[in-house]
Amino acid sequence: MEVKKTMEKIVALAKNRGFIYPGSEIYGGLANSWDYGPLGVELKNNIKKAWWKKFVQENPYNVGVDCAILMNPQVWVASGHVGGFSDPLIDCKECKTRHRADKMIEEWNLKNNENVKVDGWSNEMLMNYIREKGVTCPECGGKNFTDIRKFNLMFKTFQGVTEDSKSEIYLRPETAQGIFVNFKNVQRTTRKKIPFGIGQIGKSFRNEITPGNFIFRTREFEQMELEFFCEPGTDLEWFEYWKNFCFNWLLSLNIKKENLRMRDHSKEELSHYSNATTDIEYLFPFGWGELWGIADRTDFDLRQHAEHSKEDLSYFDPNTNRKYIPYCIEPSLGADRVALVFLCDAYDEEEVEEGDIRVVLRFHPAIAPVKIAVLPLSKKLGDEAYKIYEMLIKKYNCEYDETGSIGKRYRRQDEIGTPYCVTFDFDSLNDRCVTVRDRDSMQQVRIKIDELLSYFEGKFDF
């Protein structure tokens, strides 16, 4: 049967099964704020572990850091965020709504079959396009707009007891700058030679004007970023390497290839510091959206911080006896956005019998929130079944469930993506075997209790 995936179905399942809840819900919520429930936090943690394993732990080039969210404000002056990290805002004079001009144009283009990309356009270019094409307000259809103005996306706060300009500080809008300012520290203490990379997972904050589509774009989000430093002249070679590495990481975790594509940025779209940028995009239920940005940032960041801090951030290459400021390749992935990708991609509906639809999340076993569910056929068998649960939980994240019919319990586990169910029945009392059910095939096999641990060995590897 053809499965129609919708955001409504994904969001409903996520809320009802304990993946993601609306933030501050008992107080009426907070716009674009989401809390991860018991299953959601396990899913996201497993995704982060899978990223860290392949990008840092198992990669001989790379090491990790965990930098502070609050940094010296001069960091953001040097990086260009204070002066240039902003969105183009425009107001509709008729209905008094505020919009991001570039996103408003993109939405209008989509509805009117205009295949024009406006990334990187100046305010003047955006305004001219709105007037020439007759772009309308998405809320009321009006054409009477204010001029476009810039809105800085950084959250500003104050450090200490006084609230004045001297105590102004920002919540970081990206994790990357913490890596750049620690480049020399990491290189010196690890004695790494170029090429090498520094990975980090952490929270970032952006005061987005048009957040939305569930956890696709939020104001508080978690990033998984790698800054890979290389010799100038080798950057495009490494750029291609990391593009393919990132794409293959997604495929290795069972993301369907037909739902992925790479889109190279045009010259007009490129950031002023970028030599090349490619987005890995995913086909969400609401259409294609950016998932993973891979950018050749050249030596912009290290050079900026060297200039503003007056510190020497160059590298002496012992192989060539040459001193240079390394170029940097940055694969930047949002943990929340890729969690949404795994939810969307894993979601499936299957007609088991006529009119009987089974909803299943076909997660790769490595990222499944619950690995094994232990289910006694009857509550009378609970004591013996619970011993199996206690044995397995020392090694795997498991659930124990004795409530409801065995069929309903299987369906509950299918809906949360549990790869295996272990059923202890009345025969188990005598033959000391249990039934192991596979989520995807629904095939069942009898396994001796003493051999359960060896049976599951390697089934959740990545």
UniProtKB/Swiss-Prot annotation:
GO molecular function: ATP binding; catalytic activity, acting on a protein; glycine-tRNA ligase activity; protein dimerization activity; transferase activity
Keyword Transport: no
Cellular localisation: Cytoplasm
Reaction(s) the record says it catalyses: tRNA(Gly) + glycine + ATP = glycyl-tRNA(Gly) + AMP + diphosphate
Predominant subcellular localization, coarse grouping: cytoplasm
Gene name of the encoded protein: glyQS
Disulfide bonds: none
Signal peptide: none
Protein name (database record): Glycine--tRNA ligase
Enzyme class: ligase
Keyword Protein biosynthesis: yes
Record function comment: Catalyzes the attachment of glycine to tRNA(Gly).
Pfam families: HGTP_anticodon, tRNA-synt_2b
A GO cellular component entry from the record: cytoplasm
E.C. designation(s): 6.1.1.14
Binding site for substrate: R100, E174, F221, E222, Q223, M224, E225, E330, P331, S332, L333, G334
HAMAP family named among the record's database cross-references: Gly_tRNA_synth_B
One GO-annotated biological process of the protein: glycyl-tRNA aminoacylation
PROSITE patterns, alphabetized: AA_TRNA_LIGASE_II
